[in-house]
Amino acid sequence: MLRAYIFYRLVKNTLLTAFILSLILLTLQLTRLSNVLFGIPFKDFMGFLVVWNAYYTYFFIPEGVILSTFFLMKHFKDKKLLHVFYSFRISDFRIFLYCSIPFLTFFLISALLSNTLLEEKVAFTRKNMLFKLQEKFFSEVPAGTFVSFGAVVLHAEKREGNTLKEAFFKFGDITVLSEYLKYKGNGVFEFRRGTVITEEENYFVVKFNEYTLNLKQFQKKKLREKRLKESKVVNYVNVATLPLFFFLSFTVALKFCHGGLSYYAFASLFIVVHQLIIFVVKLML
């Protein structure tokens, strides 16, 4: 009975804590994206939410284990249940073993998902969502104003249907001045009669009758592969820290915490240390 109770409490509180932390982080992210959310299709937005919450709930499992372990030990001490356990010859070691069962469950699941749930996949989903918004944005650029989206700055004096006239276009080190500009979709811009100015080391000016610029050609495939590998390393470290913080949380909560504030202080300390470890690993990659 005690084993089942501990399993239920730790699993429920760990998942709930991890999910709440993922929602807090999501709220901060949505605050940054608030100016573009209304233009994103509902289906794509929901897909982003699912991927985000799946990854960050997984990522915050160590925090969930830390807090749920401290809360469980605090509950046992506040209710004087430890003395009851001792009277039935249930030792600290046996309680530790009971707590280890849900911990091992989380550890094994986290290890199995370490190559699947990746931070870079969340970033890719966000970029894909913004790319679809970009399609709508560039197709409806108003005339007479300077507008920017990501690394692109665009201005046109007039608009006729899908064609912009007397256009100014800047992307990174490339500036294009053209009489006509049409957005073809999928990141492709088609210019007619104008000038291309590049700014790599020296300025180069080239006149053209027709010029096509594909923004996707500037995407770096090797960089994405590198980030995928880095995401896997972060997951491995995250999983590897689980046994340490579970053991420390159980031991400290059982032996050294006697007042309400001490539980929160030690739990907060362990969470900060865990995030510092992840931060340092990311800096080293």
From Swiss-Prot:
InterPro entries attached to this UniProt entry: LptG/LptF_permease
Report the Pfam families cross-referenced here.
LptF_LptG
**Keyword annotations for this protein?**
Cell membrane, Membrane, Transmembrane, Transmembrane helix
Lipid bilayer topology: Multi-pass membrane protein
Superkingdom assignment = Bacteria
Q: Where is the signal peptide?
A: none
Cellular compartments per GO CC: plasma membrane
**Is Glycosyltransferase found in the keyword set?**
no
Q: State its location(s).
A: Cell membrane
Q: Which residues cross the membrane?
A: 7-29, 49-71, 95-117, 137-156, 232-254, 259-281
| Protein name stated in the entry | Uncharacterized protein aq_539
Species of origin: Aquifex aeolicus (strain VF5)
